[in-house]
């Protein structure tokens, strides 16, 4: 059996969708039955340090488009041209790892699975520009029609898919995201103390990791501090946006700097 994957995020995204894609493919590489081949279809080679996290082997290799020398041609290949390569390579099943499927794949007779991570652009369109929400919505509805099975990463996402896409719940499977093996590593007490000192961490704290932007609502976590014991603090890790200033203003206005 040959399974194809949309590998754009594998080679381009260092966090989020990229981590999900790399971890899933890496895990499958170890457990698929003998004779199963994994093909990772990417419009370009992306970043070496990300691509290198997925090791090519006898049952896994990357596939790139031929004669696509411009960004537009590579984008068009991923949107539609890839289907011809999937047919030529004899792919039996294609997994859209990040909520998209190429045009015409159902007509080509290739079975499909798609993972949908969230529908924030439909639940909260105010966080996106107008044209992006229209493009994302079109892709979402098209994907729901084309996919044989849909993977939702949470029960909440499943409800949103049913609500906005009118999808039969029997077509949706909830499969939670995996966790990278790097988080299983136990650091030495010396290393832990070094990090504790470097970042002046309190004894008890909650960690919030992710871009500090409005749709991730870290301000709500800050506001909840008064409901927790005084000795519990919050440590926020991530790339700041102007929204981070709102959280800082709330902290200062409510004398929470020590937490």
Which residues does each predicted region cover?
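Carbohydrate transferase catalytic cores enriched for Leloir-type hexosyltransferases
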Residues: 1-259
């Amino acid at each position: 059996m040959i399974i194809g994957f949309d590998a754009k995020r594998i080679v381009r995204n260092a966090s989020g969708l990229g981590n999900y894609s790399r971890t899933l493919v890496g895990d499958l590489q170890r457990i698929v039955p003998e004779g199963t081949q994994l093909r990772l279809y990417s419009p370009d080679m992306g970043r070496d340090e990300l691509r290198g996290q997925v090791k090519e082997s006898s049952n896994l290799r990357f596939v790139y488009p031929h004669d696509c020398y411009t960004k537009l041609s590579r984008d068009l290949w991923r949107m539609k041209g890839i289907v011809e390569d999937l047919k030529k390579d004899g792919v039996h099943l294609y997994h859209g790892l990040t909520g998209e499927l190429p045009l015409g794949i159902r007509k080509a007779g290739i079975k499909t699975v798609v993972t949908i991570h969230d529908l924030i652009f439909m639940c909260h369109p105010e966080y996106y520009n107008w044209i992006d929400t229209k493009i994302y919505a079109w892709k979402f509805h098209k994907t729901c029609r084309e996919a044989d099975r849909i993977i939702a990463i949470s029960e909440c996402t499943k409800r949103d898919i049913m609500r906005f896409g009118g999808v039969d719940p029997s077509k949706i499977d909830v499969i939670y995201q995996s966790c990278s093996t790097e988080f299983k590593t136990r650091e030495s007490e010396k290393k832990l103390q070094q990090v504790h000192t470097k970042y002046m961490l309190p004894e008890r704290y909650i960690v919030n990791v992710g871009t500090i932007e409005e749709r991730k609502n870290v301000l709500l976590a800050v506001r909840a501090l008064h409901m927790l014991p005084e000795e519990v603090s919050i440590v926020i890790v991530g790339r700041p946006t102007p929204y981070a200033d709102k959280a800082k203003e709330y902290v200062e206005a409510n004398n929470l700097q020590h937490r």
